[in-house]
Amino acid sequence: MQGFEDENRIITSTMKMEDIDIENSLRPKTLEDYLGQEKSKEQLSIFIEAAKSRNEQLDHVLLYGPPGLGKTTLASIIANEMGVNLRITSGPAIERAGDLAAILTNLNENDVLFIDEIHRINRSVEEVLYPAMEDFCLDIIIGKGPSARSIRLDLPKFTLIGATTRAGMLTNPLRDRFGVICKLDYYTVDELSKIVLRSSSILDAEIQSNGALELAKRSRGTPRIANRLLKRVRDFAQVRADGKITDKVAKDALELLGVDSLGLDFVDEKLLMTIIEKFRGGPVGLDTLAASIGEDRNTIEDVYEPYLLQLGFINRGPRGRVAMPLAYEHLKIPYPNEK
């Protein structure tokens, strides 16, 4: 679930309506054009080439990691590299076993089915998915009561690509049915800088390398955020500058948007200040913290915390969340001696 404040943040890593058109236009079509995630790219390249040489479908693939790192893009690339169709859906959208059956029976041989947020799939639907993934068949119950009978439908061989931000919530039987598992990590500043330069070329936005670097530093390791910031800074450059994005133009634009040098904004600051001021630096439990800042616990856990953990600003322990010395330093607050 996405919180209200997160929906309105320019640096949220979750998908916003404004992202759809720009992401489609900027999305790479091949693994060669896909920047970053080198280990996952190498693995997928080998497995795709092997499957194509044997004229087989690719093994089922699980992509996991924080939102905005390119899981949907990778699924699209895999289908493109395999030369097959891509069908996209999500865990919450498949409410009943019949919904899944309708999707699976309409696939062609070797097609790719991409299920986003697969950790949110209904358990009864998941049980129907097991034989579909393993034996490429569908068990359907016809009728009710004593006259009910089961029939087995053969399915075309297909590749399921599941994407999740919470791999730990997948059941073991489901996780075990994925032959290829790829963890997507936050991008480096250098990788994001290259992505910004590539995107600016496609969008016909004039940008200097130091301007791209400034955007990359504030993009929270996430390409989706980098592209969104580029779009906003391009507008700023056209109105307030000569249309060229330099490091100064990027800094001025992002300061106006409330994005600091590390990519943090008012929501991050509120979360950190709540831990530091209300709870003396922690530890504080997740539910208590969520109530204190008026946010959903899942939004805190999935959207806010991962980047703060990456920066070393907070720590998650058995007793709750604790603000670390780096957070105090960034907020220019003296670190208490007793800690």
UniProtKB/Swiss-Prot annotation:
Biological processes, Gene Ontology terms: DNA recombination; DNA repair
Region (Large ATPase domain (RuvB-L)): 1-187
GO cellular component: cytoplasm; Holliday junction resolvase complex
Compartment list: Cytoplasm
SMART domains attached to this UniProt entry: AAA
Binding site for DNA: R297, R316, R321
Segments of this protein annotated with the region Head domain (RuvB-H): 261-339
Top-level taxon: Bacteria
Record region (Small ATPAse domain (RuvB-S)): 188-258
One family name in Pfam for this protein: AAA_lid_4
EC number(s) reported in the record: 3.6.4.-
A molecular function (GO) term: ATP binding
Annotated binding of Mg(2+), by residue: T72
Record key words, sorted: ATP-binding, Cytoplasm, DNA damage, DNA recombination, DNA repair, DNA-binding, Hydrolase, Nucleotide-binding
Leading EC class: hydrolase
Catalyses which reaction(s): ATP + H2O = ADP + phosphate + H(+)
Binding site residues for ATP: L26, R27, G68, K71, T72, T73, E134, D135, F136, R177, Y187, R224
Entry text on domains: Has 3 domains, the large (RuvB-L) and small ATPase (RuvB-S) domains and the C-terminal head (RuvB-H) domain. The head domain binds DNA, while the ATPase domains jointly bind ATP, ADP or are empty depending on the state of the subunit in the translocation cycle. During a single DNA translocation step the structure of each domain remains the same, but their relative positions change.
PANTHER family: HOLLIDAY JUNCTION BRANCH MIGRATION COMPLEX SUBUNIT RUVB (PTHR42848:SF1), PTHR42848
Known role: The RuvA-RuvB-RuvC complex processes Holliday junction (HJ) DNA during genetic recombination and DNA repair, while the RuvA-RuvB complex plays an important role in the rescue of blocked DNA replication forks via replication fork reversal (RFR). RuvA specifically binds to HJ cruciform DNA, conferring on it an open structure. The RuvB hexamer acts as an ATP-dependent pump, pulling dsDNA into and through the RuvAB complex. RuvB forms 2 homohexamers on either side of HJ DNA bound by 1 or 2 RuvA tetramers; 4 subunits per hexamer contact DNA at a time.
Subunit structure: Homohexamer. Forms an RuvA(8)-RuvB(12)-Holliday junction (HJ) complex. HJ DNA is sandwiched between 2 RuvA tetramers; dsDNA enters through RuvA and exits via RuvB. An RuvB hexamer assembles on each DNA strand where it exits the tetramer. Each RuvB hexamer is contacted by two RuvA subunits (via domain III) on 2 adjacent RuvB subunits; this complex drives branch migration. In the full resolvosome a probable DNA-RuvA(4)-RuvB(12)-RuvC(2) complex forms which resolves the HJ.
Protein name: Holliday junction branch migration complex subunit RuvB
Phylogenetic lineage: Bacteria, Bacillati, Bacillota, Clostridia, Peptostreptococcales
